[in-house]
Amino acid sequence: KNAGLNPVIIDVKCFALKSAVDQSNQLTNRPDDANLTAVLEFGLDENYLMILYDNNPIITDIFIRGQDRKILLDSQDAEEKEGLVRRYVTQVKQAIQDFETKYEKRIRNIKVVSDINKIEEYLGSFRKSLLNVGFNTFDPTEGLKIPSQFQQTLDSKNDRSFLSTAVGLAFRKLDVFG
């Protein structure tokens, strides 16, 4: 409203993210992502592992404590960060094991979406804790044609995962006029 816009669509963030991932998988045409993609939302507000299997989302919440949010925001203490990573990865590992046991499919890579500034630092710790799983930030713009006036701004961003919700909403096939 402050920007002079009237919202028309209210959506659930994880489904907008699913839409962005589906679109990315379609554009990049990677056979390994065709019917099994794991996406981790790692942030201050939302934390969950979403496994997209045969176009169905399987979502597992990842819980973090209030003090863990403070650690994510501004802690420089390596021991605090290690504790947070240990608690977090334990939950991610359990969600992966539950899926792999039920569906007999292996998860090798996880696309990460995050609003955390030092995401690469945390991904390095995740990789050390779960050796058989790759963690990479999700780039929802991969495969998209970006207008030249925006390309330079986009190129300056190491982590483009923050655009996932916006890209996902743009690709949602919703009939807003009913």
Language-model segments: what does each one mean?
Residues 1-178:
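Hydrophobic/aromatic-enriched cytosolic interaction surfaces used to assemble or bind macromolecules
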